[in-house]
A protein has these predicted regions:
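Conserved polymerase palm-domain catalytic core
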Residues: 1-33, 38-53, 57, 61-63, ...
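Short proline/glycine- and acidic-rich turn/helix-capping motifs at secondary-structure junctions
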Residues: 68-80
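Short, low-order "capping/linker" segments at domain edges
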Residues: 79-93
Length: 297
């Protein structure tokens, strides 16, 4: 049996050559550098179509794209030192000691342009949000910050991990607005087969006690390990007992054939007896060890 990094590289290349061939046959023009794909398109929609096709091709080999590195962007124009200098100047404070909406609009506009010019790197947006968080902003400014960042997070999914700390909790966003965002994020992520986005939608739903009206278990059995686990925690919280049973049966099947890839999903939802075939894991379960924070179990 061949083992080792060289064998892994060979197998990866064999798989990706097949993926390349199918993408070329579909009419896409791209370059692959080891496992990084670069595709130049004329429109945003064509770029989205390429990403969807790549996701589907990789899925057929039980592989997935790295969502944090997946982005649609313009050519880079601005260096990091330049954007830090630009965003290091905070928006002007108005005569009443608060930052008014006009200044906030201009500041976030700069941050967005810099992000787009720097390979879609979320660092400028995160930096800008931190700066705004430290300022006394007007009510209109706060509403604009929240609405703008939530809108951007749908367009640029790599902003989603910032939302809990820098938007929802920082600005005490209303449950209705969070509910609306979760619904959009969930539906959009399902369409794009972005299971990281689905996982975040489920996490926000659990954390803020907001049920997703369009929740459908059928779409989630194809998700990755974390998506499956959060689906189970969501079903447990909101009393979807049939879906819970479906996921438990799914975990039992995965334990037989694909434990290593889905171990945390399998471990967390099966009991000690059901894990008996996995000695170490059964012992950990017997000791009450969990990898999930108690407030989310």
């Amino acid at each position: 049996i061949l083992i080792g990094p060289h064998t892994s590289n060979i197998l990866s290349e064999i798989i990706l050559v097949s993926v390349d061939d199918n993408l070329y046959r579909a009419g896409y023009k791209f370059i692959r550098n080891i496992d990084d794909y670069y595709c130049v398109t004329e429109t945003y929609e064509e770029a989205e179509s390429f990403i969807k096709s790549l996701v589907l091709e990789l899925k057929s080999y039980n592989l997935s794209v790295n969502q944090s590195k997946t982005m649609i962007l313009n050519l880079p124009l601005t260096s990091e030192s330049e954007w830090v200098h630009v965003l290091g100047v905070p928006p002007l404070v108005g005569k009443f000691g608060v930052v008014e909406i006009q200044s906030v609009k201009a500041y976030l506009g700069q941050a967005l342009q810099i992000m787009q010019n720097n390979n879609g790197d979320a660092a400028p947006i995160k930096y800008a949000i931190k700066v705004l968080k430290s300022l006394n902003v007007s009510k209109k400014s706060k509403d604009y910050i929240v609405d703008t960042i939530l809108h951007w997070a749908i367009i640029y999914p790599y902003l989603v991990p910032l939302l809990q700390e820098f938007i929802f909790d920082c600005y005490r966003v209303s449950s209705d607005l969070i509910r609306e965002f979760i619904s959009i994020l969930y539906k959009d992520s399902i369409i794009r087969r972005n299971y990281e986005g689905v996982a975040y939608a489920l996490f926000f739903s659990i954390k803020y006690n907001i049920e997703i009206e369009s929740f459908n278990m059928d779409n989630l059995l194809r998700g990755d390990c974390i998506c499956k686990l959060l689906s189970f925690l969501y079903c447990k919280k909101f009393g979807h007992h049939d879906a819970q049973n479906t996921l438990k049966e799914h975990a039992q099947r995965l334990m037989e054939f694909n434990f290593n890839e889905y171990w945390i999903f399998i471990y967390e939802i099966l009991n000690q007896e059901e894990l008996r075939g996995r000695g170490l894991w059964s012992n950990l379960k017997n000791q009450g060890i969990s990898f999930i924070k108690s407030e989310y179990r």
